[in-house]
Amino acid sequence: MKRILLLLLLCSTTLLMAQQTDPIQEAMASYDYETALSLIAQKKPATPLLLQKGKALRSLGLNAEALSTYQEIIGKDSTNTRALIEAAECCRTLAKYKQASAYYEKVLDLTPENKYVRIQYINLLLAQQKFREALGES
């Protein structure tokens, strides 16, 4: 009987802990990016927080600021594929196609099997009318 009671107590504690959500995550999930940014600003910048900051900035249409955030991450870890992909997307939106290509190429060097990045890179090449290069990538 003690074992069953202990097991129930542990299960309920685990469930209660799982229900606690991070206010930043909650703001991001609610598309309240301004609140998320203000909460992120109060914390010590770490890669996961900077990724969230970049996402919030991009969602608000602040692509130049988002690019700076992703570049900060890349400066600390040049193999962070998520930051590289997001930086490429920001560059593409800002019509910095040469820089976007460089980011996509870096990701493809790190993860050649990444189909999403390959497709985005091919689309970028096609948009620039670099048909031979795009054909070589497909």
Q: What annotation goes with each model-predicted range?
A:
Residues 29, 59-60, 93-94, 127-128:
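Register position in tetratricopeptide repeats
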Residues 52, 86, 120-123:
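Canonical tetratricopeptide repeat
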